[in-house]
């Protein structure tokens, strides 16, 4: 039993070394812009992917987010490993107000039906 606890602590310490600390708090329904480092030929550049977070999976350094956007009338989804060295930046553009953990129902919707209400901070309303 003691060896198992020790092994879990070792795994946690290794994962903690690979985790990024400068990431914003991300929730399902948020509108985000993810900067991804891509290599074209000999050059490396940052490509932005902007869309709605429709799912979050796993925890720790294995956390992934699924981001969906509509490009030229076609739905495009990408799964990003949040703590990957290929991810340059993640910006939350707008907070979304949703009541589901997974927004897969957005795949079946078109146009204005895919809109998500913006979350308003209760702190601002009381001031």
UniProtKB/Swiss-Prot annotation:
Gene3D superfamilies reported for this sequence: 2.30.30.790
GO MF, one example: structural constituent of ribosome
Gene Ontology cellular component terms for the protein in this record: cytosolic large ribosomal subunit
Record has Metal-binding as a keyword: no
Keywords: Ribonucleoprotein, Ribosomal protein
GO biological process terms, semicolon-separated: translation
Domain of life: Bacteria
InterPro entries according to UniProt: Ribosomal_bL19, Ribosomal_bL19_CS, Ribosomal_bL19_sf, Translation_prot_SH3-like_sf
Similarity comment: family membership: Belongs to the bacterial ribosomal protein bL19 family.
HAMAP family in UniProt: Ribosomal_bL19 (MF_00402)
Entry function: This protein is located at the 30S-50S ribosomal subunit interface and may play a role in the structure and function of the aminoacyl-tRNA binding site.
Protein name: Large ribosomal subunit protein bL19
């Amino acid at each position: 039993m003691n060896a198992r606890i020790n092994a879990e602590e070792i795994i946690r310490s290794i994962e903690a070394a690979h985790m990024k600390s400068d990431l914003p708090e991300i929730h399902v329904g948020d509108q985000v812009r993810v900067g991804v480092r891509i290599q074209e030929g000999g050059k490396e550049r940052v490509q932005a992917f902007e869309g709605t977070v429709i799912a979050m999976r796993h925890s720790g350094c294995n956390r992934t987010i699924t981001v969906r956007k509509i490009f030229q009338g076609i739905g495009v989804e990408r799964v990003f490993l949040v703590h990957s060295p290929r991810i340059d930046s993640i910006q939350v553009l707008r907070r979304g107000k949703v009541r589901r953990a997974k927004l897969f129902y957005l795949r079946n919707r078109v146009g204005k039906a895919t809109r998500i209400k913006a979350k308003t901070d209760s702190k601002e309303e009381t001031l």
